[in-house]
């Protein structure tokens, strides 16, 4: 791709059209005035056009009004007030039902809208009530647009008192989503504007902000615990006077996105959970205008109300232009039987069309130029007429200056009523080889354009002359359609369109082009056509041109593959009245257009896919394995009586959704692998289920084998462009690089794996530009790659893939995106393609506009297999029949007529606007059956506005809330036989309805069935009377009507799953052999309507047994069943292979299920009973023998009153060896290396750290070097050993359980002791802890730490180790039998070492990895306890930040423990350890520096949340920073101490990144206790993040300190002051090294002794001395004791006398009893009451944190224990 295309500046602009504030602009400048960013589309430049067109484009005024016959927003805001923000759909429906019933109009025609009374124009934006935050608001009009001008004033600032403005109704919605769309102009003086939007605003210290200052756009969030802002490269701030279209979305899950003029302002930001939780109840959305000194912000925001604004761009006088001069033109004609075209022999130009005596112009003025690579060329043309219908033009294209040397053949051909314009051959005489490097990209024919050569036109001289065109709009308030009368005079027109039509009162014409052009993003994408007004003589002509085509393109010199090229083609179709309504308009052209348009691959299936949904797998949990999804297909087939289905498999690959992206052929093994997936594909066909998969072509994760440095996208500053961060931190890719380097091969690999049968590929994310060019051309190439494999193309966004896609998720999932980002809002587009796509605005009333009851419906997508936590089966079915059946019914027809009503005023989402509703739509099918859909009222305030009547061939099939609609197609769209034809009945309200049946149904009897998950039930024979039937049935319950009696198809449940009916969907237990009281075993439904087996109230054991089929001999298997046991009675799963029996059981379930995509999670809508779910899988691992004919599985429950629930049985091959190195469930040492995990994170289950969520813990796969330490600054290994480890991403500071074992996975038996060891990686100290608990976990309340746990915090593993560390703990099973172990997220914050954003996420500071878990039963001894304790305590005694007195006591006690006898009892060991724990808790830290608590006051100018105390918190990532508004250099920071304290100097620690506020010159004044001032200065400190020191050269007993930065670094210099830390050092008395001279002398003397016993004693003392020295245990008293002891050794038979010195409690080999006591230091040392979490260097107490950090780290160190010999 030519590099110049990336950097090209706009050379022209065109008029823009939009409707209302927050609009998706319906047309815009083709390119902006700035260089095209990498995010921008890279096609569509039309520099160097013919002079008149270029001039028009260059001089067309920017006008944000949708001027051409678009209704203006009325001043009457007659809709109900919106005060609390948009309501949920459920609330709106409830309100609607509460309204009194309105009497239906007696006339057949719809009720008219009520007339509106104009009102005075008032400001739509108001300043806030708080006086200090008030600005000014004025109304102004400019160039035909009304604005509210918002200004800050002198009383405002840019921190706590900015000018704030609010708009009635603009709030965060009921679901927690915020959407803001503004069109504004910055009227401030250049570089002085500080404007933006506050979201979820509580006050200026608690909010989310998106805005700009002179340095550009940025985001920021603030909360009491976490505040930060964007520090990356910024998008430039708007130019003064420029028009800006700002779009911001903040989703409830914390994802923040923003764009201005369709340019992304930053990559997706995900708010920290703490911030999101803190602000979740805040609803305010405000605009901010800041002031600083004399700089004011002035911004004009376009208003909704544009009524009465005068436009100034329509010429007052008739226009004239050059006359046509054909004196040198030679014309010819080509014609079919119906259409004649007059063509120019010198150039492929059509002068005029004739059809049945009526004419339409083409390009009336002579034109003879082609634009190659945006260079104007006049070709040498050879004309050849092939036959009556066809002519050819051979063009020689030469431009030596631009290396263009090519030939091109263009063919004009008339076919029936069509004109085809085709480039049939292109020869580039430069050497170009697809896939190879080219030396100069100018040699490519990158783009080809015939702009200026209108394919068809209409003249103002013709009666009824009009142009009608469609652009992309996804804003429900704003139609993308333009309807323009072609008159003289008229406004200029030069604009891109997706669809375009010209018409007179006689003829209409439409144009299709395969141009994949983008004139920009938003409404300017997919602009395949260009409409242009040209004045010729005394007439105005509006012509439709094909936009530019793309041909040969490259990426950094690598030519794109051959398949990316597509020969340019365009077609014109001309028609008379096509819909027999006795008039000609665009609708006739649109009907004819279907005969020339492209048809997206797979479009014929769309109408029959009625039951779309997502089956979700995530985070290694395999919630919906492939073959279980097959059972879901069968269940829906029964419940819908055979409607077609579409199942999108999110998480088909790797470890589930958003794992392993780009490796498309990596089929998820834990959900069944390739074999099960192929089985699903094959078996689903029978039920008309179309399967698709979710992929990502925009970002990748380190685990993927396609993750490599070359494909990754970088920001301008060289940093990586980060994407989604959930299981792993993703990085965006460069899509152009990917295309040039073999992306196609990945699709081909997938096809090879799966073969045929997969229906569609859903491309996630693509379209938001995060991988670069995602515009029309790039998207079409991607779709071609997918189509080439035989797959249908689907996409995420409503605007994405308009040319090729048949399914758009954000259009279909109505809760997504907000009102500005929904389906396509264009009546023209929907008219043309309603039957081909699920891309439309659906019925979601709170969005308003087109979403308030569209007549043709629109897909409404729900789910019951885990996506978004949706597992409400009944809700899914109800929604399907309430919304989707009729939507799909209409798609079996094509639209033939569309009638709009009178504009109505709507108010929602903070906007008041006009909307023109469609009132009547006609549709026909191939058999000429006619459907008419009519809205009952044009009055938006009437309930009948939201009701329709539908007739089929004049017979009513829907009336308001009820329909009885014929359905004559099977699940695959084939016509049903007459006896199988049916009608679906559904009514959202109860009550009787009467229906006229078609004549061929009007027999005496018909048969009605209630539809349930068991199929057709409760048969009713109904009598037909006078051709009518009356139905009085349940509300929201589907029924089906047949002519004759019907039966249900036989279902073979759970094919390939080795058991019949794994999910109890059959409704019967007859396939089980039941022992015990069978009546106590029954199938019941959960709160989410999920079928379960329940055993309850049994007086004896109840067992259900079934054979496992299809097993392989001598093969290892795993089987699990979900179980929720509310009883203390044992519930078991047992497998008997005929040779061996394995059993696993659980007593009362103790762990709630927090797995969001699991149908049995503990959300109320999915709960088992009582609004909770304790469902967890219970496993049995077994190995088959040689005979597999009689392998049985048994589910059983012992006697008990309470209930036990079972569901989802799954059996599959598994090669784990966890039990004593054997596979089968059994005794022995348990080992889990995570290399062969069956499913989930066995033996752990997910804890409540995130609530019910898509868990951020998963099995991480190794991809060296990218998942390992070192790459991109990564601090820890994601995979510790082998290919897999268990990874938790980013769950720090949660004070909750990450994961835990449960007894059914590993049982810590009562009274038995186990050694638990594992290797781990942790990115920060003490953020995660190993915990031991029993019973149900009880989390701490209100953010406090859980109290019922034995907790061992774990230190980081990378600052002092080159590999993972090992932890060892002893666990004794409680008598209750419900002990468990797990990993806990503490309340401690991570330390990101100055990194932030994606870097902090990627590098692992917030992560925890586990591997090589081992649980070994041991016979507990005192020695084990002492050895384990020593591992925990030795790191603590090595620390140097505690006082000598407190540490010596601990050292001596630890040494005593190290010398304990091997046979020390358990009780004695525990007693000794308790003493040590008390001494450890009593440690006192040294005071090395002043801390915040030492000061009586800290006073300094500061930005909110960035006060001076931050410089004393020990956290390098928090800052003291003066006001961001600047101006605080030279202002003092004053620190007053509580009492005079000795200090010796200052260490200034600058911020870790950036320069703003870094001190350059400083003045430091220290006032001592006598009042004397000591002044120090420093100058020219360098601008870096290294510490800077001022050494006082003396000790000062300070009472007050004043620090002033007189010169600083940063933006502009001398604006701010900042510091990460201010460390005022305290004098330290150096600890005197231990005096060993006495010991050495005694040792020298003792070494001369000759008695063997003495020699052994000396050796023992030496060993003990070495052990104490090596392990930092030596104290003065110990040295003194050792010396005294040695001095008393003599060569004699007598024992030495007792030493004269009082000694600690040592146990040396020659000492049999205690001869001294360890002093009770705990009585002497008072522990501070509040152990703050502060850096040790500051001297602040932090006992638990620091000591656990040290003690646990020893578990990863080698221990050298001296074994002393007894006397």
UniProtKB/Swiss-Prot annotation:
It catalyses: a 3-O-[beta-D-galactosyl-(1->3)-N-acetyl-alpha-D-galactosaminyl]-L-threonyl-[protein] + H2O = beta-D-galactosyl-(1->3)-N-acetyl-D-galactosamine + L-threonyl-[protein]; a 3-O-[beta-D-galactosyl-(1->3)-N-acetyl-alpha-D-galactosaminyl]-L-seryl-[protein] + H2O = beta-D-galactosyl-(1->3)-N-acetyl-D-galactosamine + L-seryl-[protein]. The keyword 4Fe-4S does not apply. Belongs to the glycosyl hydrolase 101 family. A subfamily. The keyword DNA-binding does not apply. Residues 63-75, 84-111, 127-137, 304-324 have a biased composition (Basic and acidic residues). This is Endo-alpha-N-acetylgalactosaminidase. The lineage of its organism: Bacteria, Bacillati, Bacillota, Bacilli, Lactobacillales. It comes from Streptococcus pneumoniae (strain ATCC BAA-255 / R6). One of its GO terms (molecular function) is metal ion binding. The active site is at 764 (nucleophile), 796 (proton donor/acceptor). Substrate binds at residue 658.
